[in-house]
Amino acid sequence: MIELHPYFVSPATPTTTALDGSWTGVYTYDENIPLTSWWGKRFGIGPSARVTSRRSKKFTDKSTFQTYDDIVADCKASGELWEDPMFPAVDSSLFYSRRPPKAFEWKRPQEISAKPQFISAGASRFDVQQGDLGDCWLLAAVANLTLYPSILENVVLPNQNFDADQNYCGVFRYKFWRFNHWIEVCVDDRLPTFDGRLVYMHSADNHEFWSALLEKAYAKLCGSYEALKGGSTSESMEDFTGGVAEVFDLVDDPPKHLFRILRKSAERHSLISCSIDADPNVYEKKMDCGLVQGHAYSVTAVKQVHVMSPSGREGEVQLIRVRNPWGGAIEWNGAWSDTSPEWTCISVDERKKMGLVFEADGEFWMSMHDFLKNMQKVEICHLGPQAAAAVNRTFDDENEKKSWEVQTFDGVWTKGATAGGCRNFLDQPPRTFPYNPQYKVTLAEAGGFFLGLSIHMYNPMAANGHGIFCELFSKNIMKSTLKQFLSTP
């Protein structure tokens, strides 16, 4: 068992003392840090936000925002479709630093398709196709999300459609995990188009719109569509699950037994992505092998299969199934690709078990050897206990039950109180570094354990000017200093 306790050093009392149960009063968000007000006005429009935020009375203030039910009631009374005042159909919702490169036209799904569907024949990873926005990192996470319907339904809320007889009012809602809260985000269904086609994320089925509206809701969460250009897949996977991400550098610090890590993570329903670093001189450069530099991919399956060569030699091969969020024919063309002769070494029954399909759909298989040779980063999002319970699974590792718990603490840097500055002020005057919020880790009993540390920061004056900045500090730094704080009773 591991215990985490917040510590606070007062400038007036330079000795470190543990806080009691009233510690949240020190770290609570006040009017000087208008986080709750900002969330409430822009995103906190669902009952989930009101329930999970014990520190925010403003989430319950209906004068600050409308709930989904309020929006539906207003639309029914007026007979008009909803138009989101917080994320309007204007250029500023698309770009914050420049004007749109084209004359985009905002259209509702009924103006794009004669028979629009929210989800048609179930959501799948093939519903996720990238448009004219560099957010492959987001699409890789969305494609992974579709692998687990129970988790998907927590983000893409069910019972939404375009049927006027079933409360269709032009409003759709999604849920995202941000700063220890499930935030419900409502958007209207006006989508940017050019020449009658969706500009950004879309489904392979032109009549299906759940993925396009999900991207719009996430763009609203981040401030604009442009804010989605370039990002971290692990961040979006955490936003979809409330889980904790782990990032592996395959170039400078490749982990031992990566295949085992990937296979166990897949068995535990973790979300997995991989990526190739960008060429600074070329945007998303396609390589001769069919892979794309500066691009993120979904890992959709991890298998170890039996093979037999034409000469009768037998063995095992480790295979990774990868999906390009672009869809289409831009796929890996090396060993174990769609047209590779290696597949003749696997029995027909084994191929059926693998769900093997040879199509120009953006999905392909690679050997572990080629995966390590070409991919440069792997990001794994381990589900939190709530999401894990949703998929009805337990951690089984070598016949030993594994379980884990999550503890979260909210803190703020307040001038004159908890803003102690960087490590430069640890030993030199005014020696204020200890005033920063601290958390002591205590190993309450003997035995092995794994401790993952994830720190996110909210900045109302983020670089994009739209109020959200989420940073995952280096876990390596945390691990290197962890020994200073571990103690046993």
Language model regions located:
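Structured alpha-helical subdomains that flank or immediately precede key functional sites
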Residues: 1-489
